[in-house]
Structure formats: C-alpha cells, structure tokens
Amino acid sequence: MDPARVRLAGLLLAVGATAWAAGTVIVGDKIQEGIQTLDTLTGMLFVVGVFALVWTVLSTRGAGDGWTRVIPAGLLVLLPGAFLLNALSFGYASHDDFPLPLMILDACWPLSQLGMLVLGITVAVKGRYQGAVRWLPLLAGMWFPVTMVAQIFGGSTVSVYVSAAWLLGTHAHLGVRLAVRPVR
C-alpha cells in the first residue's frame, strides 16, 4: 500500500480520536440527557478515522491472507452504518425517539466496536506489524469494554474521562505512529 495513504489514514485516525475525546469531555454527563450535537459530530470524525484504519489493515494484510480478511471487510460494512446513524440522529432528542429503521442501524455502533476488538486480537496474533503498531489495535479494540466497566463501577463522569483517555492513548497514539512511520 502506498505510504502516503497509510499516513493519511493515520492522520484521520489521530484527528478523529482526538476530536471525539475532546467532544466527550466537553459534553460530559450531558450525554446522558440525549443526543448532543458536538458528540455526534466528533463521533462521525472518529468513525472516519477508524474506517481509514480498517481499510489500511485490509490493504496491508495486517489481519492475514486467509479467512481472517473477513474481519476488516465486515467492519467496512458496519462502520458506514455507524456513521450514517450519527448523521441521521440530528433532530432527535434521544435514542428513544428513533424510528425502527434507526434503531436497527443503531446496532452498527456496538457491533463495530466488537469487530474492532476481534480485529485487534487478529492483528496481534498474526504479527504482521512490528512493535507498538502490532499491539495498539488490540488496546484500541478494548475501548468499548473498558468504557463500559468504567461506567458500571465509576459512573458517568468517570466513564467520560476513561473514554477520552483511552481514545487518546490508543486510537490517537496509533494514528500518530501510522502517520509518522507507515506500515506496508
């Protein structure tokens, strides 16, 4: 894969993760009240960055050559659904107000995050990347479970800061590494 494209993917991931981390902290506990415009917009930037990462993993065969290519390919189907859900959520006060088609589309978010965990495991096991780039996708894939544990044991405020820190420490970190030294 062209190193310039990998650099761009890294830049998109770093910017998207940083934007969503900042948006998460700024919105804070208000996210519990319903859909927040800043969180939605920065979440869309994050999805664009994650899509670029997954495309890079597929293109560089980071998940392997065999049946494991299905993992990033599946994510390339789910992530546009997550993006579309965010785009279509404007005008609704909360997720409870969604019509049935949006409720169905809403499944793309948690399914894509589960897929990111599976992708992270696969990238780590396959070992096609070296150093931190091998392990950061696994840590990034743990964002959803870590954030949920923080929510359960620490509450909403703790979860906000854990989420932002995890996004910066894993997704943004990985994005910067890819932008500086692209994998092939």
Features from the language model and the residues they span:
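Hydrophobic, aromatic-enriched alpha-helical segments typical of multi-pass transmembrane helices
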Residues: M1-R184
